[in-house]
Regions:
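N-terminal auxiliary segments of SAM/dcSAM-dependent transferases
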Residues: 56-140
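Class I SAM-dependent methyltransferase SAM/SAH-binding core
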Residues: 186, 196-241
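A short acidic, Gly/Pro-enriched loop at the edge of an enzyme's catalytic core
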Residues: 240-252
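Conserved alpha-helix/loop element of class I SAM-dependent methyltransferases that forms part
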Residues: 148, 161-181
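Intrinsically disordered, low-complexity terminal regions of plant proteins
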Residues: 2-55
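Conserved class I S-adenosyl-L-methionine
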Residues: 181-191
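A short mid-domain helix/strand-loop element embedded in enzyme catalytic domains
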Residues: 125, 139-164, 194
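A short SAM/SAH-binding and catalytic strip from SAM-dependent methyltransferases
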Residues: 251-262
Length: 262
């Protein structure tokens, strides 16, 4: 499809969007050339190594130096503060719309072209209680977790992934099997399904499945795919127990699964 409908619900008020635009700019300042923390810290590391007459050892030694330096502590404090500011604003804005947003999810749960398979008896492993990147309630304990994640990553990527450009680019780099046949694709820990839909667009005739432990994430994934007309199936399953037969898929993909292992 050349264009896609807007799948990210608007914030409650324009002042919320303006505030988060500021937070996005703050993140750009912290990570980019505005504050230039990385270059300044690299310079401090080189000067320290030169003055003591030996190179740095392992990563842990470098980490201790950075965390002990005022510049490193300032960078870390600013990075955490902007993350806290982001989540506070998104959570507050979506919480004010909770009734409308839950109704919006329910409206799409049974719609096609793909399927949404949730397990009412699903038991979450203890490792899913680790809350990455400070997201409030983690990835599954709030029925709006999928919407929170979607807007949170919008700020995280500083607008560079608003139309799933990053996922499309990554999916485009995945090599096809040696025989060139791609009939079934599995997206592990698919969250809100951005890579899953990208695979469907690359291989429109293939059967695409995205699995995740989080029902709120999967509901948003299904809604996004259905709104865009992408025939992708989503199921609440664990990556260590997918429920599919061995060698069932021609392509298996994991976008950020191994980054977020506790």
């Amino acid at each position: 499809m050349s264009t896609t409908p807007e799948t990210l619900p608007p914030l409650a008020r324009r002042s919320d969007a303006a505030y988060l635009d500021f937070v996005e700019g703050l993140r750009e300042f912290i990570l980019g050339k505005g504050a230039d923390f990385e270059e300044r810290l690299n310079s401090a590391l080189e000067q320290s190594a030169s003055s003591r007459g030996r190179p740095w050892g392992d990563v842990e030694e470098i980490r201790e130096f950075v965390h002990a330096s005022p510049l490193g502590r300032l960078r870390d404090r600013l990075a955490r503060s902007q993350q806290e500011m982001k989540w506070h604003a998104i959570e507050r804005s979506f919480d004010e719309q909770r009734a409308q947003l839950t109704a919006e999810l329910s409206k799409w749960d049974e719609r096609g072209p793909g399927r949404l398979l949730l397990d009412p008896a699903f038991e979450h492993p203890t490792y899913t209680n680790v809350h990455f990147h400070l997201q409030p309630a983690g990835y599954y304990k709030d029925e709006l977790s999928g919407f929170l994640y979607h807007y949170g990553t919008k700020v995280f990527f500083r607008g560079d992934n608003d139309k799933d450009e990053l996922h499309a680019k990554l999916v485009g780099t995945v090599p096809a099997p040696s025989d060139g046949k791609v009939n079934r694709i599995l997206d592990l820990a698919c969250s809100i399904g951005q890579s899953s839909t990208a695979f469907h667009r690359r291989y429109p005739e293939a059967e695409v499945w995205g699995i995740d432990h989080s029902a709120p994430m999967l509901r948003v994934a299904h809604r996004r795919a259905a709104m865009q007309g992408d025939a992708v199936n989503f199921a609440q399953r664990l990556v260590e127990r997918t429920g599919f037969p061995d060698a069932h898929f021609d392509v298996t993909f994991a976008f950020i699964l191994f980054h977020e292992l506790p």
